[in-house]
Amino acid sequence: MVSMFSLFLLLIEQSPLVASLQQSQRHIVGVPWEKQHLYDSNEPDLTKWHCLNHEDIVLDISQINDGVCDCPDGSDEPGSAACVEDIFKSVAEGGGKVNKYFYCDNKGFIPRYIRKSEVADGICDCCDCSDELLSGYELFDAGSNCSQLKNEFDIMASKELSSYREGKEALEELERKYGTKEEAITRGNCLEEDKEKASAEIKVLSNRLSENRAKLEQLRGEYFNQLSHDPILYQFEQLNSTRLGSDILTSFTMVSRVSKGYQDIFKILSDLSEAYTPSLNDKVVNDNIKKFRKVRRRAEKAKINADSKIDDEQADNLYLYFTEEVPQIFLKRESENTLRYVIGKSNFVQALVEGKINYTNDILEYIREFRLIMDDISQNYNVNFQDAGVKSAVDSYKNYLGEYGELAELEPAHPSESLLRSLSEVTSFVNENAPKVLPPDAVESEQDTNSDHIGTSGDLRNKLKEILSKLNIFSSRKDLVSLEKRFRSCESQVSLLENELKQKMDYKKLLDETEDEGTNSTAGNLTELLELMGSQSYCLDDILDNYVYTICFQRPMTEGVIYQAEDKVDGKKVLIGRFKTSGFNVDLNMEKYAEHLKATYDEKSDLISNLAAIQDDDGNMQHYVFGNLNELNNGLVLEYENGDQCWNGPRRSATVFVRCSDKFKIRSVHEATKCNYIFDVVGPLGCNKTFEYEPPKFNLSE
């Protein structure tokens, strides 16, 4: 902490008693040493000074930093908050610039720029407290002094560099294990061999695909030709109930997610309502708990019952209904259930699908109300009360936002017109045609038998013809079932070959791009290493927030995948994406490294906040004055796309950022935009082998 004696000395320097001394020394607070000359007298009268952008406005030199904004460009107040930031303009003179930011000299630590809005607010944002010298306020937060921060920085840098060395050694070990070649000639030869092999595989796959497509067209013609002899089955094929089942499964995936989102935030607030301490009289918390209890009572009266497990079971059952149960009725002319049950279930399924999706809107409204309550608590609760129940709820809510952030942006869900139309068509078809292909129920059959009197030889002949006709249809249908199986099998084979061919072609393209980048590049080295690791199907997985995330490298790289699975027996598994490309992102590297430092060191001190700076020529970007520590990471980014379809949204995709460490681990996963995930991973692949530490420029002058 800054000592009271030091503060006294700093403040007394600005008092009227030493004003003349300050003028002779001419050190202007808030201005770096190389720009101090801009505040020397620029008038014949050495007691005068004119505004840097307005030579016609002449002031007494004592008016600089006097707390009154006299210059239109704000140049007379570099060390106070008197001028509104928007009026400042950069002034070029003698190759230097003056702009709208306050310069912290920070003797003993690292100089930096801060915003004028942070000046004279009673809080020392500069470790030398120079931003509060002219405020006249009593300080209520002096923070760490520059000497303390220097010691903390040295410790932090030592830990980061030690971790980097371990990561670099682990990377070199991976290269030895998987046999990467540093020699450009060897790598070039290997690359050429891989390209030739990939080209040969593409040729073989293309030929196989052409043959299978021709076979598929032949089977398709035979199948639909035979279908034309069975009008009911032909009509059913046009409905495409399998596609409908997939669409409903996709819709119910979001229904389940909304239910889980409701359950989780309801639990956070329920636990908080039991664990918080009312006697602390935190008005924000007490008022919001009352709101929660009112909303909870309203939800109970409305009989809101969100259960993601039930939603998942219903989704699976509906998928089986449309892809297996209904097709069996018309293809095999059989059902395990009575005709009455078949028709009743068809109508029930339609009502369930329509009602469930609409019911989700009610749940979303309650989620939004609960989130407003937790937003207010998280942002405005009194941290000084140290209420363990509140702190636990706020932490849980932060994790909740990371997992369910997109729910706040969801519009009211409505079944699509195409889904409703398909659902209605299948329901009507079942109701109309199931009685034509299934035997009547037992009671109805008995009534028909009692009322049917076969009294003539003509009646007997007619019955015999009907039986023989059914036998012929059965024999024909048996052939149709066999043909349908062969047709579907060939259709699947063509789809698999198309995917395999695309992956091989993408791999060949990646090899071509790697050759263009140059065999000595870091990208080339890592691409080769990823390929070699993929040849042994290298996977890493971790459990986060009740989900198992798995990232697998394959050879070729385009076969690499990311999966998300529920952490339970028979948990639902979804494909997040397939490997698309790799590269390096400098901006993301800086952002992720800053996040890492905050998460690792912020709770222990205010060091990281004292490393954040505004660059004097670019106030729109956050910069950090920790030297080039961020460059110990190479900024490796892996992109994945074409995952499973999100309900009412795009296909899933992901960006994987890899930070340097000696061991692989998935540290966090969050949804940046709808169905697009950011994976923060640590491991040797994120280490920059060519990194050499360049420390920041400390102000250690005596």
From Swiss-Prot:
The keyword Disulfide bond applies. Keywords: Coiled coil, Disulfide bond, Endoplasmic reticulum, Glycoprotein, Signal. Residues 1-20 form the signal peptide. Glycans are attached at N145, N240, N358, N520, N525, N688, N699. Disulfide bonds join C539-C552, C646-C675, C660-C687. SUPFAM superfamilies: Mannose 6-phosphate receptor domain. It comes from the Eukaryota. Residues 537-689 form the MRH domain. The keyword Hydrolase does not apply. One of its GO terms (cellular component) is glucosidase II complex. Residues 435-457 are annotated as: Disordered. Residues 163-228, 478-517 form a coiled coil. GO terms for biological process: fungal-type cell wall beta-glucan biosynthetic process; N-glycan processing; polysaccharide biosynthetic process. It is found in: Endoplasmic reticulum. It holds the Pfam family PRKCSH-like. Present with 9760 molecules/cell in log phase SD medium. Heterodimer of a catalytic subunit alpha (ROT2) and a subunit beta (GTB1). Subunit of glucosidase 2, which cleaves sequentially the 2 innermost alpha-1,3-linked glucose residues from the Glc(2)Man(9)GlcNAc(2) oligosaccharide precursor of immature glycoproteins. Specifically required for the cleavage of the final glucose. This is Glucosidase 2 subunit beta. It comes from Saccharomyces cerevisiae (strain ATCC 204508 / S288c) (Baker's yeast). The gene is GTB1.
